[in-house]
Amino acid sequence: MILRRYPRYKDDLMMLWNSLRKSGYTRTYNGLVRFIRKHLEPEIKKSAARKNKPYARAEYPGQKVQVDVKFVPSYCVTNGKKYYQYTAVDECTRWTYREMYDEHSTYSSAQFLVNLVKKSPFLIREIQTDNGTEFTNALLQKSCEHKSLFENLLDNYGIIYHRIRVATPRHNGKVERQHRIDEARFYKKMRMYSLEDGRKQLERYNLRSNDIPKTCLNYRSPNEVLQDYLAIM
């Protein structure tokens, strides 16, 4: 069963484990990884890991939500236009919300925020972004005294706004990693013919993705972890 499905999921072992588990596979994710490394993959010499400063872990859903924009890959767009995926990742549960737009501007960012607040199953205390002009005017010398539409909307909602340091995308690492996962699990396997078509496909993927286990959640899904928190909040 592993040998038959491995070629399809070799770049995403969590998806392989989830697929096998639905078919009655009982070994743990780590057990599956050990089997594959021993029997199916050549040994790879690991380089020394970089040591970063400790990062304060979010203790409850909504305490901090990372938001970022991803360029939709041109190889899956048939009409030659440019599209952008807005993504929000809750640091505590890894619950994720995504939408697609045909521009990345402060107007699109504000619209995404409105929809995020409506769809979020928890109250959002703080939002973190990079310093892109679709979010903030802070790096524009002529406009730095005036907040963007996105920033003003955050004020209206009473949501704390945090901008990461310039040129440190790792500080928004959870949403950055989710974008890499979305590239492999979604965009490399889809074709979109219009903005409406892309939005429908992304909406289905968004619902499905929150039920996929994650190693950082002890092999539970974001929805499973979220339900545990909501039961005691």
Segments the model singles out, each with a brief description of its role:
Residues 90, 102-106, 143:
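A short acidic/small-residue loop/turn micro-motif
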Residues 129-131, 140-144, 148-155, 159-184, ...:
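RNase H-like two-metal-ion nuclease catalytic core shared by retroviral integrases
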Residues 1-73, 133, 145-148, 226-230:
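Basic, flexible linker segments flanking DNA-binding modules
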